[in-house]
């Protein structure tokens, strides 16, 4: 499976082309729109989420509610584009119109300045438009398709926030993936402990009032994963490494860990490794899951537990100092539309990119032209593992 996305934040639309989805997968626009709606939710989101009620158009690769095995084309229209017709015009326009929304005061923490230098732009909007988190709309759409495949082969995925603006959320022990999914969906701040809900909302309100932003840590959990996805044979075939790349590719994500993650550096080996046992009913199991479902770059049958840390959104309503790229004089950074936090939305994006990596790996191991053959191959393999 591979894909490309295209489109600018305030352009006419966002597009994705996906190749490698097996034929026979039940799929409708509704399946994708549900996740697009989740991405636009969450406490603290700004006015654009009220403007853009994202709806996908599937224009190829699906017929009568099932995939055809051919490339799938997805499009989401940017409703806000009608206010940007001159600024985002494909054709050349008058110089005075170009200057109306020209960006020359780069925002610290964004791609503005470095993108302008790299691509020789005198209007930093050219970098802003593509580097915007608006692009993640399409990655969520792609992830929605990936999750449909995972569900068909018995793999489920969920996300929740474990640190919100420096406030650590106490998570109840031994929650299932389904329980996490339900509890997180019932929370406006995507947490599984309701006792923290109001405290987090009040904190977001205070941060917004101060013109500032906050980040946090998102945890994604995947259950039902077969043993042996990924490989130790080469560095670039390790599945945890592929997931790590996908997670830190999300806008504003600056770190990733699995299981105990960085806490492992403070413990002894006997406190970290997961003891192995075997039962007739369950086969090989681990007595703990400190390694987050991975050993040697391969899935070991335990739930995948991966966390990503998101920095605070760089666009501040009380902007930091920057420089005018024309005069090189000190200047306050440009202010674009922003939110005090986008953590709940980031969790939806993280869930999507992890699902996409997993489906790509599944299709590599169980290469199949159609869903029937894929499900049979996975079933046969699971049976083999059970009797090893």
Curated annotation (Swiss-Prot):
InterPro entries assigned: Chorismate_synth (IPR000453), Chorismate_synth_AroC_sf (IPR035904), Chorismate_synthase_CS (IPR020541)
Chain positions recorded as NADP(+) binding sites: 39, 45
Alphabetical UniProt keywords: Amino-acid biosynthesis, Aromatic amino acid biosynthesis, FAD, Flavoprotein, FMN, Lyase, NADP
PANTHER family assigned: CHORISMATE SYNTHASE
Documented EC number(s): 4.2.3.5
Recorded catalytic activity of this chain's protein: 5-O-(1-carboxyvinyl)-3-phosphoshikimate = chorismate + phosphate
GO cellular component, one term: cytosol
GO biological process: amino acid biosynthetic process; aromatic amino acid family biosynthetic process; chorismate biosynthetic process
Pathway annotation from the record: Metabolic intermediate biosynthesis; chorismate biosynthesis; chorismate from D-erythrose 4-phosphate and phosphoenolpyruvate: step 7/7
NCBIfam families the UniProt entry points to: aroC, PRK05382.1
Gene Ontology MF term list: chorismate synthase activity; FMN binding
Protein name: Chorismate synthase
Annotated family: Belongs to the chorismate synthase family.
Cofactor binding: number and manner: Reduced FMN (FMNH(2)).
């Amino acid at each position: 499976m591979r894909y490309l996305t295209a489109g600018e934040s305030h352009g006419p639309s966002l597009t994705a082309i996906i190749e490698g989805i097996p034929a026979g997968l039940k799929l409708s626009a509704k399946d994708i729109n549900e996740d697009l709606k989740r991405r636009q939710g969450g406490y603290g989101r700004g006015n654009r989420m009220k403007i853009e009620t994202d709806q996908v158009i599937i224009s190829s690769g699906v017929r009568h509610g099932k995939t055809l095995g051919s490339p799938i084309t997805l499009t989401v229209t940017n409703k806000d584009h009608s206010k940007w017709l001159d600024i985002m015009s494909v054709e050349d326009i008058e110089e005075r119109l170009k200057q109306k929304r020209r960006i020359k005061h780069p925002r610290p923490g964004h791609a503005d300045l470095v993108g302008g230098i790299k691509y020789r732009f005198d209007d930093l909007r050219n970098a802003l438009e593509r580097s915007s988190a608006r692009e993640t709309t399409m990655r969520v759409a792609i992830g929605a398709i990936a999750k449909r495949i995972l569900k068909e082969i018995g793999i489920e995925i969920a996300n929740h926030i474990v640190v919100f603006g420096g406030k650590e959320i106490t998570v109840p022990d031994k929650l299932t993936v389904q329980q996490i999914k339900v509890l997180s969906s019932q929370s406006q701040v995507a947490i599984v402990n309701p006792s923290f809900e109001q405290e987090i909302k009040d904190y977001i309100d205070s941060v917004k009032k101060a013109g500032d932003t906050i980040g946090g840590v998102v945890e994604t959990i995947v259950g039902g994963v077969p043993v042996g996805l990924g490989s130790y044979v080469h560095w670039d075939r390790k599945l945890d490494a592929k997931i790590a790349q996908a997670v830190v590719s999300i806008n504003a994500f600056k770190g990733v860990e699995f299981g105990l993650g960085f806490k492992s550096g403070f413990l002894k080996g006997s406190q970290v490794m997961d003891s192995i046992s075997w039962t007739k009913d369950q086969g090989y199991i681990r007595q703990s899951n400190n390694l987050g479902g991975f050993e040697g770059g391969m899935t070991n049958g335990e739930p995948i537990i991966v966390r990503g840390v998101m920095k605070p959104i760089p666009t501040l309503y009380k902007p930091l100092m920057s420089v005018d790229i024309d005069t090189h004089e000190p200047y306050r950074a440009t202010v674009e539309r922003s939110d005090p936090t986008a953590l709940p939305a980031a969790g939806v994006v993280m869930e999507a990119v992890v699902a996409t990596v997993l489906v790509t790996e599944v299709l590599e191991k169980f290469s199949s032209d159609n869903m029937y053959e894929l499900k049979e191959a996975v079933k046969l393999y699971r049976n083999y593992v059970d009797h090893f």
